[in-house]
Amino acid sequence: MATLRVSSLLASSPSSLHCNPSVFTKCQSSPRWAFSFSVTPLCSRRSKRIVHCIAGDTLGLTRPNESDAPKISIGAKDTDVVQWQGDLLAIGATENDLARDDNSKFKNPLLQRLDSKLNGLLSAASSEEDFSGKSGQSINLRLPGGRITLVGLGSSASSPTSYHSLGEAAAAAAKSAQARNIAVSLASTDGLSAESKINSASAIATGVMLGIFEDNRFRSESKTPALESLDILGLGTGPEIESKIKYAEHVCAGVILGRELVNAPANIVTPGALAEEAKKIASTYSDVITVNILDAEQCKELKMGAYLGVAAAATENPPYFIHLCFKTNSRERKTKIALVGKGLTFDSGGYNLKTGAGSKIELMKNDMGGAAAVLGAAKALGEIKPRGVEVHFIVAACENMISGAGMRPGDIVTASNGKTIEVNNTDAEGRLTLADALIYACNQGVEKIIDLATLTGAIVTALGPSVAGAFTPSDGLAREVVVAAEASGEKLWRMPMEESYWESMKSGVADMINTGPRDGGAITGALFLKQFVDEKVQWLHLDIAGPVWSDEKKNATGYGVSTLVEWVLRNSL
């Protein structure tokens, strides 16, 4: 690979769970229970090593390759852009940075000096390509000694999303050129405070790390990106910026885990596989994280009838209830919180089977996107180790399948707080599993809860594929999460909790039904979950059905990990 020298460019099946369909429903006139459980041990052949290195047979004999997360040396440097040496230089420029003088020369000092070294090639190329610095624009210059990429940042680069996009564009150019050493710089840092520069460097690093990552575990042949080092130029140096970049690396590792969990098919990531991944996280960070995995029999003892009702039909892959706890040795504790993730490793819809092209049943492996975000956050926090906060990570993992033992439309299940639910739609199963998970979280004595779930298609209709819906009765918690999401560059929008809609969720024979009319479906879904949260606990529900998956890239996004980690840190000492 040639080295870019800006100053001289022109010179050179096992046992399983069986239970009767109406799990944990007790008729008032008949106190009899009828259960028959036979539970696969957690370390059975089907769930021995999870996601990163599966051992044992799976349906289709698929065995993924090792995870190939990027290993990049990242540093903040004060090297002059014009003097930097490497394979590819990416420069982020706003529309103002591209302004020209009367002689069609750049007014921006950095672009002016760079263009002078290149004998006007930069200005000529930007004119020829009609590059004006608009968001989404980019041009690539192939030069004898390497490449230069100009990336548009729009009218102003004032958000982490802009710098994240710059990093992603740099990563795309690096992959195309198979570059080993790249640098990223801003054309201008005018108006950026010292803190903003640090945050910008972190966002750029995040964009490069996530942009360079490719999930090739299920490809018979793949090309590993060549990128080895990233220099971030002109945004400062020193311990603070290096610490922020290291933080970004830890968060990206969590995001990549989240992506891999969602990308992996349901014949690889089963409920047992998620449980094993949780055990792996606890083992890796045993100084701060403990794990407790409950099997079906233990969940039965806790009267988790809503969760077990959903899981009843999955005779090949029994449910596992996952509870990780993060706690440092510090005696000081600011707050105690819980992160709850929906963990449906596959959702067929049950007897209300998903049918037709619009059902996207082939993508129902992503119905555990909430669980993936929670486990990704656990991994990141295990590395970061914030002080003074206790975090409970909770996932009720199971499959929603069809069998003679399965839950039927019209069945009534009883949650662990005693509330009864008439199941009028077996495809509204996630909220049933979350009901028992939220009750369990409240029983841990937490003060705040965030749950994440691919809960409704209605939220995608309302907000589109890129924005999550946030539901909470707490204005204070809403502000906390919105600020954390903005700092992380993830998009969410607070939605109303219209209490009058609850009337449509009332049952004639039980306390409630599990799904209401089509209109306002995302709201009634959130109102349903609210029935299982203690009134004294602050709670926020994130419906991530849209941003969990990118149709354009045909890949998981890892949505939620960054926001969760940022929110936890803001609740720490």
From Swiss-Prot:
GO CC terms = chloroplast; cytoplasm
Q: In the UniProt record, does the keyword Transcription regulation occur? A: no
Ranges annotated as spanning the membrane: none
EC assignment: the record states: 3.4.11.1, 3.4.11.5
Please give the catalytic activity noted in the UniProt record: Release of an N-terminal amino acid, Xaa-|-Yaa-, in which Xaa is preferably Leu, but may be other amino acids including Pro although not Arg or Lys, and Yaa may be Pro. Amino acid amides and methyl esters are also readily hydrolyzed, but rates on arylamides are exceedingly low; Release of N-terminal proline from a peptide
SUBUNIT field: Homohexamer (dimer of homotrimers).
Q: Which family does it belong to?
A: Belongs to the peptidase M17 family.
- Could you tell me what this protein is called? Leucine aminopeptidase, chloroplastic
Report the gene name: LAP
